[in-house]
Amino acid sequence: VFPRHIVLYRKPAPMTQALPLQGRKILIIATDGFEQSELEVPHERLTEEGADVKIASLEGGDICGWDDGDWGEDVTADLTIAAANAADYDALVLPGGQINPDMLRTDSDAIALIQAFAAAGKPIAAICHAPWLLIEAGLTKGRRITSFESIETDVKNSGATFVDESVVVDGNLITSRCPDD
């Protein structure tokens, strides 16, 4: 499972100490327009904690981030979303940005993959605008969710309770407002 005690900016454990996520496999799904820090920081921190982190995208290959109002750096995906199997991973991370989740929520493979993680009770972390994907997957009704403020109405309209906190954990769903929190 995805430990709740991870703090994004904690100093990495010394190499002589067992890493908290050693042996865990985490999947990040993204496409062009992902918020740069919302993919790179979780990838870096999870890797530092010992997790084997893979990135899946719509077409595989390079995807381009969005950083401070302009196109950012490319990141290379390890596999396509269609080739990813929830059974192979322990948790799922959904970076936000406006473009990334808006494109992914219209992709049936992406939504089916998110639903498969949920059906297995595996942790799903959704950052910023990524709760749009949870809404599209039908996972928010009756749940406590946070998100970037501009999609608060979407969260409420999906039947979720919007919580204005930096991070909200409700069962297997972990949501956060934005990278600045």
Which sequence ranges carry the predicted segments?
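A short beta-strand/loop micro-motif in the catalytic core of glycosyltransferases
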Residues: 124-125, 145
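Compositionally biased, low-complexity intrinsically disordered regions
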Residues: 1-2
